[in-house]
């Protein structure tokens, strides 16, 4: 992993620090680097963005963990097993949406889909493969997974482009934890490892709710 540092001494004026960050951004852009892992609480992302350097995208990471996020939320709320109801809200049946619905149905029989054609080919496929029927709409759901924008309510888990990622601590096996540098955005680092095929998704877990 390549690490880039910006010199900051006690008393370094803010204008100078911002200029140094911009210079680093330009060097990264000239080198063809477009995605980086930010430090925690990094306040200079806008400056890097102006130079064409952006944070590692974490959307695919969180969408891939959607079913696990739902189980975690249900457990935290004390919803009894067998009584939980989860709604998946989406404008399109993407691969991530389909995988999430299928994963949910393997454990929960009260899964609803708020999406175009919720009783169409996808629902019939699930009935044939799992013997499970999708509910429609999202009324009465204990947890809503929002793959597309909806008017939000308490307890929703936003997973659409532009949404802030869930505030959930991610945990990896010890062999990985020992190699993660301190002071970096863990979600961005894990997303980068996942996208590069270095980290199996099954090894990503959450700290206790």
What is each PLM-predicted segment?
Residues 1-46:
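Metallocofactor- and cofactor-centric catalytic cores in central/energy metabolism, strongly enriched
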Residues 6, 158-209:
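Adenosine-phosphate binding glycine-rich loop
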Residues 7-9, 38-41, 89-92, 113-117, ...:
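Structural motif
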Residues 26-35, 48-57, 104-115, 125-136, ...:
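Structural alpha-beta junctions
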Residues 38-45, 59-64, 90-97, 116-120:
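Gly/Ser/Thr-rich loops at beta-strand to alpha-helix junctions
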Residues 54-72:
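A glycine-rich, Thr/Ser-enriched phosphate-binding loop motif common to dinucleotide/cofactor-binding enzymes
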Residues 77-140:
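Glycine-rich phosphate/diphosphate-binding loop of Rossmann-like nucleotide-binding domains
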Residues 136-168:
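Short, well-ordered secondary-structure micro-motifs within conserved domains or adaptor modules
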């Amino acid at each position: 992993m390549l690490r880039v540092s910006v010199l900051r001494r006690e008393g370094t004026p803010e204008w100078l620090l911002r200029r140094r960050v911009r210079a680093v951004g330009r060097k990264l852009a000239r080198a063809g680097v477009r995605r980086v892992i930010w430090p925690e609480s990094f306040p200079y992302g806008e400056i890097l963005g102006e130079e064409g350097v952006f944070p590692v995208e974490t959307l695919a990471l969180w969408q891939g963990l959607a079913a696990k996020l739902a189980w975690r939320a249900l457990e935290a709320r004390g919803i009894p097993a067998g009584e939980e109801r989860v709604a998946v809200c989406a404008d399109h049946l993407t691969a991530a949406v389909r995988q999430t619905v299928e994963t949910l149905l393997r454990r929960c029989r009260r899964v609803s889909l708020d999406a175009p054609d919720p009783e169409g080919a996808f629902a019939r496929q699930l009935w044939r493969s799992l013997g499970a029927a999708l509910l429609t709409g999202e009324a009465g759901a204990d947890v809503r997974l929002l793959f597309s924008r909806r008017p939000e309510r308490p307890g929703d888990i936003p997973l659409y482009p532009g949404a802030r990622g869930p505030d959930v601590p991610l945990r990896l096996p010890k062999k990985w934890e020992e190699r993660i540098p301190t002071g970096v955005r863990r979600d961005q680092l894990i997303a980068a490892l996942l996208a590069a095929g270095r980290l199996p998704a099954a090894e990503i877990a959450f700290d206790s709710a």
